[in-house]
UniProtKB/Swiss-Prot annotation:
Negative regulator of class I heat shock genes (grpE-dnaK-dnaJ and groELS operons). Prevents heat-shock induction of these operons. Belongs to the HrcA family. It comes from the Bacteria. This is Heat-inducible transcription repressor HrcA. GO terms for molecular function: DNA binding. One of its GO terms (biological process) is negative regulation of DNA-templated transcription. Keywords: Repressor, Stress response, Transcription, Transcription regulation. SUPFAM superfamilies: GAF domain-like, Winged helix' DNA-binding domain. InterPro entries: GAF-like_dom_sf (IPR029016), HrcA (IPR002571), HrcA_C (IPR021153), WH-like_DNA-bd_sf (IPR036388), WH_DNA-bd_sf (IPR036390), WHTH_transcript_rep_HrcA_IDD (IPR023120).
Length: 339
């Protein structure tokens, strides 16, 4: 167990190395961070940190740099996440508030996260299995054709044109719309199949076949597909860190092209109020083992809808990045809840 002074030395080493990308020496630490101890004492502390695997000496004439273990302890000992400035929070709110639909929200979120953190931003679309039906609309296009529109509470819109087996009057269309909304509006998408299992059986014979066709279209519109969408932005930011990856950024870029990998990376963030940090994990895609991932779920009323985060080198400004991810996740959840 490290004492508080050694933790302070480790924090200073991480902060300086993240800022300068240069090995950190004891004299520079004392001067820059006002540690109130001699360089010799700091050297002893650095030797202890090195013995325990928190820092390493890249070559004999150099200072020290943090290891994966050192970054991990640094993050775990952050007592609070550094808050964003009032101006930054207003900019986030203003930028996201201009979104016109779910696709625009996701697109803006990716761009915003990449700009705020100067890392690669990854945003998952809200998954249907975490969504609820907000409203259903039936629009009569002709006597034998209707347009079905289903809107979820996450802003997702699904449309289907339905060819009916027979004529359906305007009054019957309105009645079916009202009854369907009464049955499933406000209900979770995963519960809809059970809720509509006997819906058509309760309809008058004259519109039972139309009801069956419409229910089938509703179920098709709300089927939970596992090809969940993930959007990536800011990949060019990796070019800022040419020395932070063992060989090149190419393996990282290749990993970022695999949706399954990204969903797995973000999937562990399940609570909107929580920020998770993965550093050089071994159980991920090989191309991401030299990276760090900062992620959080977004949602409303404590219910997670999906996740977002950033991918970058282990030499990352963790306090600022964690604050940005937390703030953006909070605003995205709020906007989806309001709209």
């Amino acid at each position: 167990m490290l004492d508080e002074r050694k933790l302070e030395v480790l924090r200073a080493i991480v902060e300086d190395f993240v800022s300068t990308n240069e090995p950190v020496g004891s004299k520079a630490l004392v001067e820059r961070h006002h540690l109130k101890v001699s360089p010799a004492t700091v050297r002893n502390d650095m030797a202890a940190l090195e013995d325990e695997g928190y820092i390493v000496q890249p070559h004999t004439s150099a200072g020290r740099v943090p290891t994966k273990k050192g970054y991990r302890l640094f993050v775990d000992r952050l007592s609070t996440i550094k808050p964003l400035s009032v101006a930054e929070r207003r900019a986030i709110e203003h930028f996201l508030a201009g979104a016109v639909d779910l696709d625009d929200v996701i697109s803006r979120t990716v761009r915003l996260l990449a700009q705020l953190t100067r890392q690669v931003a990854v945003v998952q679309y809200p998954t249907l299995d975490r969504s609820a039906v907000r409203h259903l609309e039936l629009i009569r296009l002709s006597g034998t054709r209707v347009l079905l529109v289903v809107i979820t509470d996450t802003g997702r819109v699904e449309q289907r044109q339905i060819d009916l087996p027979g004529e359906l009057e305007e009054t019957d269309t309105a009645e079916l719309r009202n009854r369907l909304n009464a049955a499933i509006a406000g209900k979770r998408v995963v519960d809809v199949p059970d809720l509509l299992a006997t819906f058509a059986d309760g309809e008058p014979p004259a519109r039972r076949s139309a009801a069956t066709a419409i229910v089938s279209a509703v179920l098709d519109a709300l089927v939970i597909r596992r090809d969940e969408r993930v959007v990536v932005g800011g990949a060019a930011n990796l070019a800022r860190f040419p020395t932070d990856f063992p060989e090149s950024v190419q393996p990282v870029l290749e990993a970022l092209e695999e949706q399954v990998v990204l969903i797995r990376l973000l999937g562990e963030a399940t609570r909107p109020s929580e920020v998770l940090v993965r550093i050089g994990e071994e159980d991920v895609h090989e191309g991401l083992r030299s990276t760090a991932v900062v992620s959080s779920a977004y949602g409303s009323k404590g219910r997670a809808l999906a996740s977002l985060g950033v991918v970058g080198p282990m030499r990352m400004d963790y306090p600022t990045t964690m604050a940005a991810v937390a703030a953006v996740a909070r605003y995205v959840g709020r906007i989806l809840a309001e709209n």
